[in-house]
């Protein structure tokens, strides 16, 4: 089945190291991850680490599948939305960070793919925008 890839790039007014720290610290992840109430993991994170994310309406287990400090962080959902992967690429931009967020979804069926593409509540780009706004707020703390 075909995959859907969503990419969002922006500049965040903080150094790469600080952005990477906020993205990868389980204690701050619930601040920027949309609808997350809690994130449970044993820090520090590394490739292969597993995290439990408690959202408003569901729970998910995610596994870190890409970790290259301070430039790359990525995970794959192991429970909940099993076919979703999220990646963050951080690049030096002076005193700021160029941040690219990519969400990749491997649709299990044509019907599932159509639901995600057509259903307003599955507004992936809107969720990515909320994630970035939340991250900006978390960086101000």
Regions found by a protein language model. Name each.
Residues 2-4, 47, 56, 82, ...:
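Residue-level preference for beta-strand/loop junctions
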Residues 9-13, 40, 52-54, 63, ...:
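Generic structural detector for well-ordered beta-strands
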Residues 78-130, 137:
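Beta-strand/loop substructures that line and gate deep hydrophobic ligand-binding cavities in soluble
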Residues 19-23, 29, 51, 64, ...:
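Hydrophobic pocket/interface hotspot
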Residues 13-16, 65-70, 89-98:
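A short, structured loop/turn motif at beta-sheet edges
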Residues 49-56, 73-79:
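Short beta-strand segments that buttress and anchor functional surface loops
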Residues 5-7, 58-62, 82-87:
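Short, surface-exposed coil-to-beta transition loops
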Residues 1-42, 137:
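Hydrophobic ligand-binding cavity/cleft-lining segments
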């Amino acid at each position: 089945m075909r995959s859907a890839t969503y990419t969002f790039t922006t500049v965040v007014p903080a150094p790469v190291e600080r952005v990477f720290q906020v993205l990868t610290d389980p204690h701050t992840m619930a601040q920027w991850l949309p609808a997350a109430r809690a994130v449970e993991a044993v820090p520090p994170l590394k490739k292969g680490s597993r995290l439990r994310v408690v959202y408003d309406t569901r729970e998910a287990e995610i596994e870190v599948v890409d970790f290259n400090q301070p430039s790359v962080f990525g995970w794959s959902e192991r429970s909940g939305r099993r076919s979703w992967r999220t990646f963050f690429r951080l690049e030096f931009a002076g005193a700021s960070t160029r941040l690219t967020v990519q969400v990749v979804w491997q649709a299990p069926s044509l019907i599932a793919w159509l639901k995600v593409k057509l259903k307003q509540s599955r507004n992936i780009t809107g969720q990515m925008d909320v994630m970035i706004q939340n991250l900006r707020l978390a960086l101000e703390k």
